[in-house]
Regions:
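Extreme N-terminal, non-catalytic leader segments
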Residues: 1-14
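Hydrophobic anchor at the beta1->P-loop junction of P-loop NTPases
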Residues: 17
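Walker A (P-loop) phosphate-binding loop of P-loop NTPases
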Residues: 22
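Conserved lysine of the Walker
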Residues: 25
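Hydrophobic positions on the alpha1 helix immediately C-terminal to the Walker A/P-loop
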Residues: 28
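N-terminal phosphate/diphosphate-binding loop that engages ATP/GTP or pyrophosphate donors
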Residues: 34-101
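Small-molecule kinase domains that catalyze NTP-dependent phosphoryl transfer to phosphate-bearing small molecules
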Residues: 80, 125-131, 141-144, 148, ...
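ATP-dependent NMP and nucleoside kinases share a basic, alpha-helical "lid"
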Residues: 96-175
């Protein structure tokens, strides 16, 4: 069967995808970006890069004064491969692999709750959306970073399903963890993300909420593409 064309108008636009950890935001957003021919921006990777820098310097990630002090010394960059893969650079060094280590997750969550860090990265993220049509995923894209995005999606799934998916992902990366531990960490991060003072995780009032608990990857991707197509036409 011939694949249907996406039929998205040729105009500048932004798609904001928010949701809790492990909801599949990055995997789906990357696939949709490739389908639509637009830039994919994984803001979680940007915060992971800050978290990695903080850990490497031995700084307590919740110590805002200490974290703020090193921000001017950090040059955060991105490089895109031909296949659209986003690589993160820290002071010129490719840290894409390092920031995905399991222990960086809690550092990323902690530093992302700091107003100083969010302010430091906000203009960088907005500048990308001004220069390119983007699909950007994170925790506060539709509410804070791109409040005027043409399409806003809040992607979610049950904690149990997200934990199962994360376990599979970690196993594929060669860094397996027990399901109970992954579930506990997800629940902890959900609480931290939704209760932080700076830009807590929540769906924008005009966001379309999509629960993928009962959907596989292909069904989730097609559902999101249909929503985006409907909003932009």
């Amino acid at each position: 069967m011939r694949e249907m064309q996406t039929m998205i108008p040729e105009k500048h636009y932004a798609v904001a995808v928010d949701g809790p950890s492990g909801a599949g935001k990055s995997t789906l957003a990357k696939a949709i970006a490739a389908k639509l021919g637009i830039l994919y921006v994984d803001t979680g990777a940007i915060y992971r890069t800050i978290g990695y820098a903080v850990k490497r310097r031995g700084i307590e990630p919740r110590d805002e004064a200490a974290v703020r002090a090193i921000l001017p010394e950090l040059e955060i960059g991105m490089r895109y491969e031909a296949d659209g893969e986003q690589h993160m650079l820290l002071n010129g060094q490719d840290v894409t692999r390092e920031i995905r280590l399991p222990e960086i997750s809690m550092y990323a969550s902690a530093v992302s709750a700091l107003p100083a860090v969010r302010a430091f990265l906000l203009e960088m993220q907005r500048d990308l959306a001004r220069k390119h049509s983007v699909i950007m995923d994170g925790r506060d894209i539709g509410t804070v970073v791109l409040p005027d995005a043409e399409v806003k999606i809040f992607l979610t799934a049950s904690a149990e399903v997200r934990a199962q998916r994360r376990c599979l992902e970690l196993e594929q990366r060669g860094t397996p963890k027990p399901y109970d531990e992954v579930l506990r960490e997800l629940n902890e991060r959900d609480y931290n993300d939704s209760h932080r003072a700076a830009a807590p995780l929540r769906a924008a009032e005009d966001a379309m909420v999509v629960d993928t608990s009962a959907l596989d990857f292909d069904a989730s991707r097609e559902a999101l593409l249909a929503l985006i197509r409907e909003k932009l036409q």
